[in-house]
Amino acid sequence: MTTNTARSFSDKWTKNPQLAFAETLREGSDIQQWILSRNGFASRAALRDYLAPCTRVLDAGCGNGRVTALLRELTPPSCEVVGFDLVAADVARENLRTASNVHIEQGDLLADLSRFGEFDFVYCQEVLHHTGDARAAFLNVAGRVRPGGELAIYVYRRKAPIREFTDDYVRDRIAAMPYAEAHAVSAEITELGRVLSAQ
């Protein structure tokens, strides 16, 4: 992970520790439905049924712990839920301080992950492409899946060339800005996108 990427995610989670947390847990929310549908589940109940036999679940690259909390809600009480993140472990730990049988650690997807052991289900989404070596990170995470277990990953797909160019252009311009300034510029661009989409 580059220094700018690490700084950006550290700022994102430390300055917004509850970002999308409640919405991720709220049944029927757009965020929760997106998480469920992109992983092939029609409902919370379907994911709960899938997770029922799990004894260990990992959220690799857990950010503020919002999906870790969802996994905790949907797994049996005896299931150990582990989350780790390179830059936001403290934020996730604080957000999940009252959750039972949840362990949050600092961890790097590019480092040796054997200390975490093996898991029945490993969730690693919106993370691999930010590591600087997605292939190595994928292989590390895949190595934590027990025989018969499952790995659920999500990486951003490459968009149309003009969109990729625009994303790179904007990212290059705001990368060195202080967080608040970069956030304000991003909010303006997002609003412009909404206005243009509504036309």
Identify the function of each model-found stretch.
Residues 69, 131-136:
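Short N-terminal helix/helix-N-cap motif within the alpha/beta-hydrolase-1
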Residues 130-131, 160:
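Short glycine-rich, flexible loops that bind phosphorylated cofactors or substrates
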Residues 127:
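Hydrophobic adenine-recognition pocket in adenosine-nucleotide-binding enzymes
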Residues 135-147:
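A short glycine-rich, Lys/Arg-flanked "PGG" loop and its adjoining helix->strand segment in the class I
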Residues 1-117:
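Conserved N-terminal segment of class I S-adenosyl-L-methionine
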Residues 193-199:
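Alpha/beta-hydrolase
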